[in-house]
Amino acid sequence: MGINFEDQTTLFNFVVREGNGVKGMIDSGLSSVPRPFVQPLSERIPTQKALTCEATQPIDLSNLDGPQHKEVAKQIVEAAETLGFFQVVNHGVSVELLELLKSSAHEFFAQAPEEKSMYLKEVSPSKLVKYGTSFVPDKEKAIEWKDYVSMLYTNDSEALQHWPQPCREVALEFLNSSMEMVKNVVNILMENVGVTLEEEKMNGLMGTKMVNMNYYPTCPSPELTVGVGRHSDMGMLTVLLQDGIGGLYVKLDNGEWAEIPPVHGALVINIGDTLQILSNGKYKSAEHRVRTTNIGSRVSVPIFTAPNPSQKVGPLPEVVKRDGVARYKEFLFQDYMNNFFGQPHDGKKSLDFARAE
């Protein structure tokens, strides 16, 4: 007997509470989008007139070590001050590893529902691993068309012990091989505002590291749904691997949306709220969203770097001295996290929590 997806409680329990996910719904033979996933008109993504973001030609990071260092640093700074997004190549992560990463993401989500649902927040054997669907489905007007698994990093041995078997080794290698690049980018951005971060401060501001694997199943009516709604990331920097299907959109200054085109072997970097706050607004956290598609299932793998929950965050004193005013207050990052995860995606509204009164 099939699932009655017309009954919204049955649907929600099947997808979210029992951990079958959007993928389980599609695998059951679903041919139309159920009402709880239909987005309001204002949130739908009109793909037929999508712009391509020309400002994201990949930056070659291998040139940081040579005479072109200043030019590359300038490109990074300009992207951080304007779009909040840029792509990089020669970033220190092998293309072979990136391909393995995409394969392992597909392998994880191809498992039987019970193999994934064991990591639902309420029953997960480890506080480091969480599997789920959408962002905060209990509170959303419309559920996002996405399943995911989050893997929090504490140390290598705990990752290899607790992260899901199909992806633990490759996800850990991705994280570890990306961190030098991340620190180089942060140092360039700090140097540009006249700040040198001591190692202890850097570790505090980037002490939370998480690898996510996102799965966007093929959708019968992409024009009705979103993979991820409008939001900015809460942390310092996000490093993202996207596959060849595409669907990542960034909001431009003029209010229009443009797609960040997939580039084979490249990684996407975007500025998070924390860097916007530290820089007193000089750097821009990027408002972005993800569309769905009917041409195949898409995967993406972001690394999120953010402060330790116990870290105090606010505009850096050197920057406030230069600007003459602090545009954001100082706060405990745990409080920012609670606010961020306590409400549905709504553009950059989460930043209101940090604004100076």
UniProtKB/Swiss-Prot annotation:
Names of the cofactor(s): L-ascorbate; Fe(2+)
Signal peptide coordinates: none
Residues where 2-oxoglutarate binds: Y216, R298, S300
The record's free-text note on cofactor binding: Binds 1 Fe(2+) ion per subunit.
Metal-binding recorded as keyword: yes
Disruption phenotype: Accumulation of scopoletin, but loss of sideretin root secretion in response to iron deficiency. Impaired iron-uptake ability at elevated pH leading to chlorotic and stunted plants; this phenotype is rescued by fraxetin and sideretin treatments, but not by scopoletin treatment.
Pfam families per the UniProt record, alphabetical: 2OG-FeII_Oxy, DIOX_N
Keywords tagged on the record: Dioxygenase, Iron, Metal-binding, Oxidoreductase
Transmembrane parts of this sequence: none
Domain Fe2OG dioxygenase: 206-307
InterPro entries in UniProt: DIOX_N (IPR026992), IPNS-like_FE2OG_OXY (IPR044861), IPNS-like_sf (IPR027443), Oxoglu/Fe-dep_dioxygenase_dom (IPR005123)
Enzyme Commission code: 1.14.11.60
Pathway participation: Phenylpropanoid metabolism
Induction cue: Strongly induced by iron deficiency, mainly in roots.
Catalysed reactions, semicolon-separated: scopoletin + 2-oxoglutarate + O2 = fraxetin + succinate + CO2
Organs and tissues of expression: Expressed in both primary and lateral roots under iron-deficient conditions, except in apical root zones, and mostly in the root epidermal layer.
Enzyme category, top tier: oxidoreductase
Biological process according to GO: coumarin biosynthetic process; fraxetin biosynthesis; response to iron ion
Single GO MF annotation: metal ion binding
Binding of Fe cation, residues: H231, D233, H288
Function: Involved in the pathway of sideretin biosynthesis from feruloyl CoA, a redox-active catecholic metabolite exuded by roots in response to iron deficiency in order to facilitate the uptake of iron; this pathway consists in the successive conversion from feruloyl CoA to scopoletin, from scopoletin to fraxetin and from fraxetin to sideretin. Catalyzes the biosynthesis of fraxetin via scopoletin hydroxylation.
Annotated family: Belongs to the iron/ascorbate-dependent oxidoreductase family.
Name of this protein: Scopoletin 8-hydroxylase
